[in-house]
Regions:
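Membrane-interface transmembrane helices that cradle and orient dolichyl/undecaprenyl
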Residues: 175, 213-224, 397
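Transmembrane-helix motifs of polytopic, lipid-linked glycan transferases
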Residues: 134, 146-171, 344-349
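Transmembrane-helix signature of polytopic, membrane-embedded enzymes
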Residues: 142-145, 162-190, 208, 360
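Multi-pass, polyprenyl lipid-linked donor-dependent membrane glycosyltransferases
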Residues: 150-153, 168, 183-215, 224, ...
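Short hydrophobic/aromatic helix or loop-helix immediately within or flanking a transmembrane segment
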Residues: 92-110, 114-140, 314-318
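Loop-to-helix entry region of an early transmembrane alpha helix in multi-pass inner-membrane enzymes
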Residues: 116-122, 126, 130, 138-160, ...
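Membrane-lumen/periplasm interface segments of specific transmembrane helices
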Residues: 57-73, 243-342, 346-349, 355-362, ...
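Signature aromatic-anchored transmembrane alpha helix within multi-pass, membrane-resident enzymes
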Residues: 276-280, 399-428, 436
Length: 437
């Protein structure tokens, strides 16, 4: 060691003493960036995100309704240029639901001179109008005000449950894309016929109950699921395909238990048998009640025939003549292309990434409505309840991230445009004759 080293250390010490106290140094600038407004928004609870998407979509649709009402002619429900509440509370099937709420169901089916059953309220299920009637009784409010408001609030609850149904029912897809539940909600809200979620129709209640049934089934709350399915059976004629979902769920649980990946005891089996029975009974309960009250065992089917171009209800029969009515010689190619597109959506990898319950519901429900309806102007509205297909659509392009965003944005813009077109073309009523939305 150099002899100068101790001296150098001493010099440093002396300098430090003679220099006096040092001035406090300025705090070092933080290197952590402040959170921007978008980061703060992303940190909000999931349900706030869902309700923001829902609120924005409902305001958008309300604007489309208000715009369309300005060109609405006088009609059987209102005068020209109806108010927003009249426009969404009285037109088309809303008028029938109002009749149910205010007058109930007839004890005798109306018939024409040939004895054929005419259009009547028995075609419209009771849960939604009776709920509104109860609120009318409690508050003294009118149908025009309360029915669209109840539907709007039910739609808010529905999208919250849709989010959770996707989160719990498609774990593999959500693990790969955590934003999938919210993307699903956005596409459901933007679906071309989602405007009905704020009119006096049953779509809001039905969407809530379908999503709740699937969520409870996935979470294995079979008793609660049975109660919800019973309510669904008195909301829309869509409880029967839920039985197929229950069977698939039971089969998957049994198979996994055989492989040691799950448990499946007698209590589980009994709960699922009861749930399947509830779905089956709920699917026929309202037609049975109609037959019992009117004294006509097939009164519900005869009532449905009154809305069809051909007076018969035979599974899939409508597809033999309706496409030609709408598209002429192009009817068959259009029908085949539509079926092919539907099958493709069910079979793409994004569909298989859904859980078995969501995947089965989409397939069973679509097959069911294709079997029982006469394909027409209401078909697109019925597809709204196949909400897991929105998750499939959002997940078609998984990566890269920029391509996924471009795809989602393009689909969203297209759907919103079609939504405005649907309101303008389908909800606006032509007094000289029109098709129901």
């Amino acid at each position: 060691m150099s002899a100068d080293a101790p001296r150098a250390d001493a010099d440093v010490a002396v300098d430090a003493v003679t220099a006096g106290p040092t001035e406090p140094s300025e705090p070092a600038p933080t290197t952590e960036p402040r959170a921007g407004w978008w980061d703060r928004v992303r940190g909000w609870p999931w349900w706030v995100h869902v309700l923001l998407v829902w609120a924005a979509s409902r305001l958008f649709v309300a604007g489309a309704f208000v715009w369309t009402a300005t060109v609405q002619e006088a009609n059987v429900w209102t005068g020209a240029n109806p108010s927003y509440q009249e426009f969404v509370g009285l037109f088309y099937d809303a008028g029938w639901y109002r009749q149910v709420a205010e007058s109930g169901y007839p004890a005798e089916l109306p018939r024409d001179e040939q004895g054929l059953v005419q259009q009547n309220p028995w075609a419209f299920f009771p849960l939604f109008p009776m709920l509104v009637r109860a609120i009318m009784t409690l508050t003294g409010g009118t149908w025009v005000v309360l029915a669209p408001t109840v539907a709007l609030l039910l739609s808010a609850a529905a999208v919250l449950v849709v989010h959770e149904a996707v989160r719990h029912g498609a774990p593999r897809a959500v693990a790969a894309r955590p934003g999938l539940p919210l993307a699903t909600v956005a596409l459901v809200c933007a679906f071309p016929t989602a405007a009905v979620l704020q009119v006096a129709y049953t779509e809001s209640a039905a969407l809530l109950l379908v999503a709740a049934s699937l969520l409870l089934l996935v979470r294995r709350r079979y008793g609660w699921a049975a109660l919800v399915v019973v309510a669904l059976g008195f909301t829309r004629a869509v409880a029967l395909p839920m039985a197929a979902v229950v069977v698939v769920h039971a089969g998957v649980r049994w198979w996994r238990s055989r492989r040691g990946e799950d448990t499946f005891g007698r209590r589980d089996a009994a709960g699922l048998v009861g749930l399947a029975a509830a779905a089956g009974i709920s699917g026929v309960a309202w037609p049975a009640i109609c037959g019992w009250v009117t004294g006509v065992p097939d009164g519900y089917l005869q009532t449905q025939e009154a809305w069809r171009g051909v007076r018969e209800v035979v599974p899939f029969s409508g597809w033999t003549y309706v496409p030609a009515f709408w598209f002429g010689e192009w009817g068959t190619p259009v029908m085949v292309a539509g079926f092919a597109l539907t099958a493709a959506v069910m079979l793409v990898p994004a569909a298989w990434r859904l859980g078995p319950e969501l995947h089965t519901w989409s397939a069973a429900y679509v097959v069911y409505i294709l079997a029982v309806i006469e394909p027409g102007s209401s078909l697109a509205r019925f597809l709204l309840l196949a909400f897991p297909l929105a998750a499939v659509t959002a997940g078609v392009v998984p990566r890269p991230a920029w391509a996924r965003r471009v795809w989602f944005g393009a689909v969203l813009v297209l759907m919103l445009g079609l939504q405005v077109l649907w309101v303008r073309q389908m909800w606006q009523f032509n007094p000289q004759g029109d098709w129901p939305p």
